[in-house]
Amino acid sequence: MQQLRTLTPGLGLAMTIAAGGAFFTTLPAAAADGFTLKDKPKIAMLYFGPKNDGGWTQAFDEARVKIEKEIGQKIQFVENVPEDASAIKPAAEKFIQRGANIVIGTAFGYSDSFKDLAAKYPDVAFLNGSGTTNGSNLESFYGRTYESQYLCGMAAGAASKTGKLGFVAANPFGVVNWTINAFALGAQKMNPNATVNVIYTGAWNDPVKERAAAAALIDQGADVIGQHVDSPTPQIVAQERGVYGTGHHRDLRQFAPKATLCSSVWVWDRFLTPELKKIIAGGWKPAQYGAFIEMKDGGTDIAGFGPAVPKDKAALITAERDAIMKGKQIYAGPLADRDGKERVAKGAVLSDADLWKMDWFVKGVVTQK
């Protein structure tokens, strides 16, 4: 899901940044009194992939089920809507013609189509996961995945016997690089000498490439495999090879119960339920530049721990989670990159704009294609 293509979900925001600029684009600002539905709420969702993909889309579907219980109504949905206007617009309009007045998207590539739809249907509220467009009746949202990946890194550092960790990454974009760096910083909190060897697959969801990358990292000595790709394949390979891993998107113990130490998971219901209630109540004011969600507000969280994480280490990780929930910043200074260049000064925190365009790595991270 990227401007470079057609990139898959959850990862396109980074590519919209100009140096120092905002990462969301906007439509005209919301009216002072906000957006209010004209009829009773009827909600529909457009899924990028199948609801049982084991990752990104399934996390949204699981959130849908929880949201239905919270708001007391069913949510319609359609699966496998590709990032193409010729598919997105008809899918959304089909629901709108049936009375839907709240439409939720789940892909970066829906951004422009949702902008057009929001302008065409001013009485419909639009939300889009990992989108980049916003307006008076449109809000994009994404989570700060580096927070949960930092905690997964702590689990990896605690479980590793060698201090050599591997990481299967999709593409070398800021939104992926910030998870790699956070994973490394978390691991180094438990073991200051921990290293993270990274292989990029060049794809968001390619189990064949993910299997090859995970196997190569293990062959190179990694005894824990982290990931920022859509499928559970790296965890499956870790279990097959007798090492450990940390998952992404969902709790991947389902696929590798012996190997998976913990997972960085989406908890979309924690954000979407209150956001939908605001829309339903009336006077909704979408965030001007979209919602960049912290863990405490329902972005991501962790699921685990596996038995390889000692209880005392699990307690430390839980304490760090509590600190993050209270406002601890992962990218607080002083912080230098692997070449010794200062990236965050003492007393400062890395800006959101710099997060989205992150192209540097902390000490101990080794990247390869």
Tell where the protein language model's regions lie, with residue ranges:
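Short linear, low-complexity motifs centered on an aromatic residue
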Residues: Q2-R5, L27-A32
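Short linear motifs in intrinsically disordered/low-complexity regions
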Residues: L11, G21-A22, G34, K40
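A residue-level marker of the well-folded mature domains of exported/periplasmic proteins
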Residues: A32-K369
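Bacterial N-terminal signal peptides that target proteins for export
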Residues: M1-M15
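C-terminal segment of classical bacterial N-terminal signal peptides
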Residues: M15-A29
